Design a protein with these regions (language model features):
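Beta-strand-dominated extracellular/periplasmic modules and repeats
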Residues: 7-100, 107-109
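Short, Lys/Arg-enriched N-terminal segments with co-localized hydrophobic residues
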Residues: 1-6
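Compositionally biased low-complexity segments at domain edges in trafficked proteins
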Residues: 102-126
Length: 126
C-alpha cells in the first residue's frame, strides 16, 4: 500500500545446537538479489551476546522478484569453537526471503549444528 514503509526489518535468533546455547559472534552476510541476477551485499554482521541480529532493509525499489539472502557462516563458527572435528561438508547455511508480503518485520530463528540446521518463520504479519 502507499502508506507501507519502505524500511523492513529482518531478524534472527541463532542457537548453537551442539552446546545448547545462543550462537554468539556468528558471522552473517546479507544480500539483495535482483531478478536480473545481480547479488548486492547489504550487510555483514555478527550475532550479539544473545545470538541475535537485526538488519534494516530499504525495499522501496524492490519488485515482486526481489529476494533477500542470509548466509550463516556456521562452518567458520564451529571451527572457531573447536566443534567441527567431524569435518562436515556443510559450511554455510543460506536462507532466501521474499519480503513482498511482509509489512514490517520478518523473524527467522535458526538452530545450527555442524551437520544440520532447522529454521522457521516467526512474524506478526502472518
Amino acid at each position: 500500500s502507499s502508506r507501507e514503509s519502505p524500511m523492513k526489518s529482518i531478524s534472527s535468533h541463532v542457537l548453537d545446537g551442539v552446546r545448547g546455547s545462543d550462537a554468539i559472534d556468528l558471522r552473517v552476510s546479507a544480500y539483495c538479489l535482483a531478478a536480473s541476477g545481480e547479488r548486492r551485499k547489504i550487510a555483514e554482521v555478527r550475532t550479539d551476546m544473545s545470538g541475535r541480529l537485526t538488519i534494516e532493509v530499504d525495499t522501496r525499489d524492490d519488485d515482486s522478484e526481489t529476494r533477500y539472502e542470509f548466509v550463516f557462516h556456521g562452518g567458520e563458527y564451529f571451527a572457531e569453537h573447536a566443534l567441527h572435528e567431524l569435518k562436515s561438508p556443510i559450511h554455510e547455511t543460506v536462507i532466501r526471503l521474499d519480503l513482498s508480503k511482509v509489512e514490517a518485520c520478518c523473524h527467522v530463528p535458526i538452530i545450527m549444528s555442524p551437520h544440520t540446521y532447522s529454521t522457521w518463520w516467526s512474524s506478526s504479519d502472518r
